[in-house]
Amino acid sequence: MTSLRPPRPTRRAVARSALALTGLTALATTAACSRPVVADQAAARESRGPVTMWTSNNEQELAWGRAIAEAWNAEQPDEQVSLQEVPAGASTEEAITAAIVAGTTPDLLFAVSPAATTDWVRQGGLVNLSDFEDGAAYIEERVGEPASGYAHEDGDYYQVPWKSNPVMIMYNRELFEAAGIDPDDPGMETYASFLEGAQKIVDSGASRSAIWPAPTAEFFQSWFDFYPLQLAQTGGTRLIEDGTTTFDDPEGVAAGEFWAEIYARGLAPQETSTDNAMAVGTTAMQMAGPWAIASYQGTIDFGIMPVPTQDGRPAEEITTFADAKNAAIFTSSRHQRTAWDVLLFATAVEQDRTLLDLTGQMPMRTGLLDVHPQYFEENPAYRVFAEQASRVADVPTARGSIEIWQRFRDAYVASAILGKRGVSEEFSSVAHDIDDLLGAGS
């Protein structure tokens, strides 16, 4: 099926089958005995030489990667960077896990999914960046307080938080106006007022649907419907905190029941869109990050607002899903010192500006608006995302994270989207299952 969202630079479609998930788990189990980790990691950490860097396969990030490689290579003739895209696969997470098993990982990856890092570390696939003398300090200085959310369970860093796509609600201003909603001040901050506005959109005939999240069961889809609302409602409480699930508490259930009401009223379709639904006018809203601006700019007159909360938190208090992609070095790298230097180079202020110019995605850096004022002055549509980027949370660092998210997604689809079971009962049941899984993995 075709994704309802415009082509998204940070994610590929993921096969939902149980076989694929079982295969991923099997890869994680067998990888430790088949990866070609460099035997002398201490020597590799100080070694310099040519390195390979992988990025996502979308045009914007490949353009950024080429710019980084060319700039580096012009100054470092003996430590050249070769750029490749992540190999095709069901998902980036599965492709990298398979590469760890096969021994084909690059030195550097600029497409790290935080959901997969804990298992990759347990496989022995990622270099501990805190072992570099300036590693932890650099990460914490660059990212600030949110950096702690990307630390491994041992407190060390195996990834550098690189870029985020804070999830907000983009809407078609023309369709809002047609429905009698003020596009400059929609007044849809609460669950109740959002439902009221969504009902107006459909009842007025302004659009076939009010909002159209992907109703499919891939593990990551909850990051773009339920999870931003849980984070917003709780001030940033993640799906798992301190080794225990949180989503079956009153705030999580309220977020799930909000979406259940959306679907029960027919305000969001239960099928997948076959085109860019908001661009063609078959829906009025989408959950999206700054990556989507390029898809709508010049096509529709759009607005941006925070995700709703039960009682309407002020915009400046809303936390949403970061949708981050990060950078890491693999233990198969023979020249980890060069890889680290390239990583530092690629995440410097100058290269952050290149990232903004080429992708519109938000560098994970404190004071982003102050660091790049000219960019946001020249590109005001991105400013609201930059403001939101300082208030984000990501997926929890947990063993078996992808399986956990898949179990949650299956329960969410059955209850909130399809209405086969009540949200509260289904959330409680799957929370017990996931807690058992977390306990077994500890």
Question: Which stretches of residues belong to each language-model region?
Answer:
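Extracytoplasmic/periplasmic solute-binding protein
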Residues: 153-162, 167, 177, 192-244, ...
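Long, aromatic- and glycine/proline-rich binding clefts that accommodate carbohydrate-like moieties
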Residues: 357-410, 414
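Extracytoplasmic/periplasmic substrate-recognition and gating elements
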Residues: 70, 74, 82, 179, ...
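Hinge/lid segment of periplasmic solute-binding proteins
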Residues: 112-166, 223, 305-306, 377, ...
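Glycine-centered hinge/linker elements that transmit conformational signals in sensory
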Residues: 196-200, 241-270
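A structural signal for short loop-to-beta-strand junctions that line the ligand-binding cleft
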Residues: 98, 106-107, 136-176, 315-319, ...
